[in-house]
């Protein structure tokens, strides 16, 4: 894999890099973050909280970073003035995706999936999973918080919008989502919440 790509979504810079399966993402993320912040990788002030979420606070209070790896790729995000989460998912057949959705998703999302034929159902399942995981990574609890505690739905233009979320996550209207194909067969999502709204 030789993919090198970068994007800018609002206040967030993102980079996609090749990544060796089975290796931790943090060393490579530190390299990218250090370059972007103008410091040596070992001086990037990443600290993990009790749940394992990496933070740049308190040293860089207006910055946030996150990363995700899937397959042979690593996605790294660096934001200013936001709390962010990223997710990268390699799309692969999920024969029991409705079982997974029934177990983890919000009832409104399950209803959306049930109404679809298999191909669009799988596409929407991965979009929902990726969006939800990115938001929960931004929040700092990960999947253990509960995927059912937030609900996305496609807007008329097809973009996913957060319809509802547990009040602990803040106001649904303040969350922003960007989703895209980061690489062949790899779906990416970025969720961010303005620090000024916390």
Model-found features: residue ranges?
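Core catalytic alpha/beta fold that binds nucleotide/phospho-ligands
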Residues: 1-198
């Amino acid at each position: 894999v030789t993919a090198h790509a970068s994007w800018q979504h609002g206040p967030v810079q993102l980079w996609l890099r090749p990544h060796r399966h089975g290796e931790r993402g943090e060393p490579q993320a530190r390299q990218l973050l250090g370059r972007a912040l103008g410091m040596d990788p070992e001086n990037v002030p990443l600290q993990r909280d009790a749940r394992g979420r990496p933070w740049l606070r308190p040293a860089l209070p207006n910055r946030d970073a996150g990363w995700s790896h899937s397959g042979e790729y690593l996605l790294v995000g660096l934001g200013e003035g936001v709390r962010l989460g990223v997710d990268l998912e390699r799309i692969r057949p999920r024969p029991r995706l409705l079982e997974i959705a029934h177990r983890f998703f919000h009832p409104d999302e399950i209803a959306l999936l049930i109404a679809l034929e298999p191909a669009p159902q799988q596409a929407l399942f991965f979009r929902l999973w990726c969006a939800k995981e990115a938001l929960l990574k931004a929040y700092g609890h990960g999947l253990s918080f509960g995927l059912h505690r937030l609900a996305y739905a496609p807007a008329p233009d097809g973009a996913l919008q957060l319809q509802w979320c547990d009040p602990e996550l803040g106001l649904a209207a303040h969350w922003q989502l960007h989703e895209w194909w980061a690489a062949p067969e790899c779906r990416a999502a970025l969720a961010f919440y303005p620090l000024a709204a916390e």
